[in-house]
Amino acid sequence: NIPFVSIHVPAYKEQPHVLAETLQALSRLNYPNYEVLVIINNTSEEYYWKPIEKLCQELGDKFVFMNITCTGFKAGALNAALDYTNKKAEIIAVIDADYVVESPWLIDLVPLFDDPKVAIVQAPQDHRDGNESIIKAAMNAEYAGFFDIGMIDRNEENAIVVHGTMVMVRLSSMMEVGGWGTDTIVEDSE
């Protein structure tokens, strides 16, 4: 049994070439059972969304393009996506529009949901241009400390921090809490 994963990519006035890199990386995932919902929210300018709509068509049936107007910022867009999520989905994965995943992302992390007590899996992250300068290398070192030490300690105490991107959530758990909280401008601060 390979769980169906619905990947949600919210975007607000994101540069098309940046979002295109994200979507192309998602098209190369080595996981057979997923969809990608691209949620362009509150962005009326065609410059931002028209090339992405075309790219989603080119990438095939796994990619669903939506251009919506909603309230609640990113969380509102993610909640709207829940209405379009494939009924087979067991896991929701969220990736920001400017992230690039490696092909084994899902195949490596989805098995963690075999434990029915697992509701959230937070993947570590780095800056893709972390080797371009000392400042960016330092930012990656900061991330490494957070993920390699802090998150491991939190996991042992069942007190994980959701970063808002590179996160996977069991859909039934998400629905149990009523979706993403829209009371704050950033959905991962609640």
Question: What is the meaning of each model-derived region?
Answer:
Residues 23-33:
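Short, acidic, metal-binding catalytic loop of nucleotide-sugar glycosyltransferases
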